[in-house]
Amino acid sequence: MFSWGLSCLSMLGAAATTLLCAGLLLGLAQQLWTLRWTLSRDRASALPLPKGSMGWPFLGETLHWLVQGSRFHSSRRERYGTVFKTHLLGRPVIRVSGAESVRTILLGEHRLVRSQWPQSMHILLGSHTLLGAVGEPHRQKRKVLARVFSRPALEHFVPRLQGALRREVRSWCAARGPVAVYQAAKALTFRMAVHILLGLQLDEARCAQLAQTFEQLVENLFSLPLDVPFSGLRKGIRARDLLYQHLDEAIAQKLHEEQAAEPGDALHLIISSAREQGQEVSVQELKVQNLPAVLQESAVELLFAAFFTTASASTSLILLLLQHPAAIAKIQQELSAQGLGRACDCPPRAPGSAPDCSCEPDLSLAALGRLRYVDCVVKEVLRLLPPVSGGYRTALRTFELDGYQIPKGWSVMYSIRDTHETAAVYRSPPEGFDPERFGVESEDARSPCGRFHYIPFGGGARSCLGQELAQAVLQLLAVELVRAARWELATPAFPAMQTLPIVHPVDGLLLFFHPRGTAGAGDGPHL
């Protein structure tokens, strides 16, 4: 018995020694990791590095970021300030928020910083995208794509978008059970992007399959840049290659068309631009120029820009309107004042039947421009729940920001969400839902930094080209919802919001929809 006790004590002592040594080694490794980045500061500058933590060797604070979501950034902002350092996705990062600092970053494109996204995102989206282009190639690509979002193009899109949104709202009202709004919004925005923006002719089954593959790609965009079995990057690469296979046939058909089925769509403009530069080259010559690969990557980039972000904002719009019935009443008043308060005359469809409606669209860009309160609601949704949390840049040279040095070569991430949350230029607290805050402009909002308090679409040379189209989609959705439907929670409480990779409700937002004027079947909050 005595020898057994000594044996146990010996084993416990050995285990304790092992744990102590492991702890000391981990602590030493962390200190050496921190020292490695401290020594990487630009010694030509007397300014210190921003405060912050570089986390654990190689992993940095990536795991904390993935687990904590938006709380990761807010907790460090409270501890270190609006400019702090961290280490995410394999790179040292300076996190920036606040209008003045964000203005420096966004207006410093090509001078202080250049666009940079996580390596995994660059690998998955490709090298021919607007997102990854720098300098003159970026300006040329932006010039081509700007034609897609010109006012004549938007005038062409609006009636088709309204028709698609009207049919979707009617289908939600005809559903026999609860609708998972986020999933439905993703399917809807993907169909609109494929058929209206890209002009591709795909049937519903193929479009749904394409959407599922694309979603898997986007879910792995922000992953560690390690191409090993079962890694997020490997899953994303498989999804991307499968997506290219699906797109190849549709793009090949597009290349053989003399004129687009829907003039003005994005792929038609890219093809036309290549032909103009090549003086009407043939399809075979376009293929030699690697145009199919360019079109594949451009199509995926446009889908990424239109798909998840618009679906996220659409879901947030529906959620916030449900939480704030007073906004619904004001939208109804504005629609009535503009003679737009009446929904289509088609009778409500029986549950399970086709949601088709033969009514002509009655909205245009000019009509949307007169709906001032609807515009304020959309802006407030994008301010309170911006779909994308921020943007990435790389420092081209060491420069000063808020009393700190930003070393050359380090990544800079400007925060949209944190900037919105801390802006003090509005007449009401920034954490509340108040569309009318956009009805009155304060003196601070007119300052040089004023427009950088509200940046859901970024700013500067990299501002979102499709922002007017996105806002039009949200305005159309608000109008069609308010005048045609009522909706209520299908769950006991409102869901929490997840912020990575795109803002969305954790349960997809389960709601019951009813045609306006009919009795609801639920007991939860409803409109």
Provide a role label for each language-model segment.
Residues 414-444:
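Conserved cytochrome P450 K-helix/beta-meander segment immediately N-terminal to the heme-binding cysteine loop
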Residues 2, 52-71, 92, 118-201, ...:
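Cytochrome P450 catalytic-domain helical core, especially the substrate-recognition surface
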Residues 40-43, 257-269, 332-371, 384-404, ...:
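Cytochrome P450 fold signature focused on the C-terminal beta-domain
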Residues 57, 150-152, 239-313, 344-349, ...:
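Conserved cytochrome P450 catalytic core segment spanning the I/J/K helices
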Residues 60-81, 238, 242-245, 249, ...:
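Conserved cytochrome P450 K-helix E-x-x-R motif and the immediately C-terminal K′/meander segment
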Residues 2-129, 134-136, 140, 162-170:
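N-terminal membrane-proximal hinge/A-helix region immediately C-terminal to the signal-anchor transmembrane segment
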Residues 1-23, 165, 213, 336-337, ...:
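Cytochrome P450 proximal C-terminal region
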Residues 309-334, 468-483:
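Cytochrome P450 catalytic-core helices
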